[in-house]
Structure formats: structure tokens, C-alpha cells
Amino acid sequence: MEPRDNQAEASYTFGDRSSSDIVVRLRNEEGRDDWIYCHSKILSEKSQYFADRLSDKWPTCKILDSRYCVEVICQESDYDHHINLLRLLYVVSDDVHEDNLCHNVKSALGILSVAKELSCPQIVTACVNYLEAVPWEEGEEEEILRIVPRIGSEAEPILARLQPVDQSAVLEIFVSAFRFATSSPPLLLGDIKSSAQEQIEYMITEDDDAPLLIADEEVKLEVKQCVKSLFVRFFQCLEEITLKPVESEVINKKGSFRMVLSDMCWVFQILTKMEVVRDFVITWADISEKLVKVVEQLETTVVEAVEIRVKVIEVTAKVIEAIGYGTVILPTAKRLQMVKLWLPFVRNTKPLVDSPVREDEENDTVRYKIDGEIWQALESSFVSIILALPSADQAEILTEWLSKNGLYPDLTEAFEVWCYRSKVAKRRLGLVGGEEENGMS
């Protein structure tokens, strides 16, 4: 019985000068020059490049020593990969697994490039199988994207994990993530929920790349359904506080009201990017009267109650801004109501937040601050809403503000504009009326 080929090949040892019948002279431009003792049988069978170089058809085959010394010139960065590839030619076979040939991503990439250059199909396959299966670091991923596309179709499996998926798959994962991001999972899953919210925002944001998901009608419908469910939870919390404002579980440290408010603040940002905030704003405006009444009856010395006020203001600031700058158009009466409800609430809450609120005396930790930009945005939004109201309503609001000694929010701009408009009103409107009469005569 004749020995199998791989058993015969086992008799050859890489670098064994005594049995070698060919030298691979490896050189680079930096002057490095190594003579590597090999065997023509191994090289010819495992590499088409060496098979061609050692064949009778090679142009220099009849030159003395040309068939006994093959010169390979390479870059310094690929030098060690060439040596490793020559070594692997002695061990690669169908019986040797990829994890015994490759030991890390960097080495596998380097050997893959050389194997492609020297036409070593078994080595190429082994490297591809290895790279397709192992995890990559971020830096390695960029290197893979640089090298693998040059290899050709045989290396395509490596890039399978980076390929874009069809929109139906994107939609499915977006909807699943959005449902989870607006749900109330156990506290232990809080980090996962936060991650879901971050990735949803990333998916629909246009940066250096186009958004992963286009907010078409199907997407908007799914999002609206999730927001409706979130409002149902919000109403349930509100009812519980209404019935038991002090003992209610929803305002203690393990309660859900603050979490719902945090979710609503996040949801509003997403709805803004998707240009579907109208339903949210209208619903918030409709429940504002009850919400203000319920929250104001909470004891302000309770830390959790102050945090609830903060969360309510964070959501309200976004709603007021949408109304103030015309993103959502509401009737005059509703806009006036929003100012009369939220202006005093915001004014009364600011001192509570600006004064340090401590969780306990032992750690003396300051909690529940509102970003200064939110106060400023609220102020600007209130001014915009007020200046769009009828003059008489403006006067009523400004009179009340001045009676409070000009406390926050600063409505000076609205006051100045009101004074100017009121003083010149007769002349301006008379001029308009005169122009109309002249035009009709």
C-alpha cells in the first residue's frame, strides 16, 4: 500500500538544508536578505506561483541555478508573513484545522495577502475560514476592510458580518428595539434599555452616513403605537398619585413615574427627528392642567418629588418649544392656557432646583439639577408664545409677571415688544386701513 501524500510530505522539514533541493531567496529594499531552504515538491503542489517558476515553461528556466533559487522581493511589512506562509505550506492539508494554522487576526490577514499573491489556494481558504469565524477588534476591522476586498470573491465570506441588510430586517429590529425602549422592564435591564434608546437615535440620525432607517408611514405608525402605550402608563401613574399622593409607590425610589417621564423626554427627541411630534404635543397640552395640579400637591421637601418636577419640566420645555416656534400649531386658547399653567409652575420650581437638594446628610450629594440651556430655552419659548397671543392676553401675563418683581422667566423682551406695538398700534393699523381705503377708491 502506497503512503498517502501528506504522509510523504511529512518527511520534508521546512528549512532542512540537507534535504532541500531549492532555495527561496527573500529580499526587500531595506537590504534584508534571507535564504530559506525548501523543497520543490512542496512548493509546486501548494503554490501555483512556485509551480510556474519551477516549470520548464518559465522564461529563465535554462539559466544556470534559476531552478534551484527563486528570488522573491517583498515589502518589509510583509516580510515575516512570507516566511510564515512558506512554513505553512509544509503543514497545510485537509486534515489540519484552521485554528492550528492561524493564531491571530493580524497574522491571518498578512498571510492571506501573501497567499493570494503567491497563488496558494489552500492557505487562502484556511485564512478566510479563520477570519470569518473569529471576533475582531475595532482596529482589526478597519484593516480587514482595507485588505480583504483586494483578495477577490473567495474572501467574500469574511465580510458577511459587515454587509448591509434589507430594509425589512432593519424595520423589524427597529420596531423591537423601540418597543423595548418605551417599556418598563425590571431595573436590572436598565442598561440594556438605555443602550436600545441610544442605538435607535443612532439609526435615524444622519451624520457622515445616511440614516439606517427612513421614517416612512409604516415606521411612523409603529412609533405612534408605542408612544400611545407609553402615555397609557403615564396616565396610570398620574391616577395613582391622584389617589394616594404621599403613599404612592410610583414616586418612591423604585417607582415608575420618573422612569416614564424620562422615557417621554427621550421619545420626544425621536419624534422630533421623525417629524411626528404633533400628537405628543396635543396630548401633553390636554393633560397639562391635571398634571400641574397633581405634581404641585406633592411635598416639595421629598427628594423624589423634586426630581419628578425636574423631569416634568424637561418634557414640558420640549413641548413649549415646539409650540413657541410653530412646529405644532395650536389654537389661541390652548396656547394661552399653556402659558398660564406652566409659567407659574416653572417659576415655582426653579428655586427648588437651584437650591441644592441633598439625598441624605451622610454623603452630602447634590442631586437633580436642570441644565442651564433648558431654563434659557424655556424662557425663549415662553416669550415666543406670549408675543403671538392677542395684545390683551399679553398685557394680562406681563402684569402678573411684573407683580412678581420680574422673577424667572425673564419676559423683558416680550414686555418691550408689547410696549412698542401698543404705542404705535393706532398709527400702524390706521395706516393699513388708509391704504386699503385708497386702494378701493
From Swiss-Prot:
Keywords assigned: Ubl conjugation pathway
InterPro entries noted in UniProt: BTB/POZ_dom, BTB/POZ_dom_prot, SKP1/BTB/POZ_sf
Alphabetized Pfam families for the sequence: BTB (PF00651)
Domain annotation BTB: ranges: 20-98
GO terms under biological process: protein ubiquitination
Pathway the protein contributes to: Protein modification; protein ubiquitination
Keyword presence, Signal: no
Protein function: May act as a substrate-specific adapter of an E3 ubiquitin-protein ligase complex (CUL3-RBX1-BTB) which mediates the ubiquitination and subsequent proteasomal degradation of target proteins.
Domain notes: The BTB/POZ domain mediates the interaction with some component of ubiquitin ligase complexes.
Protein name: BTB/POZ domain-containing protein At3g05675
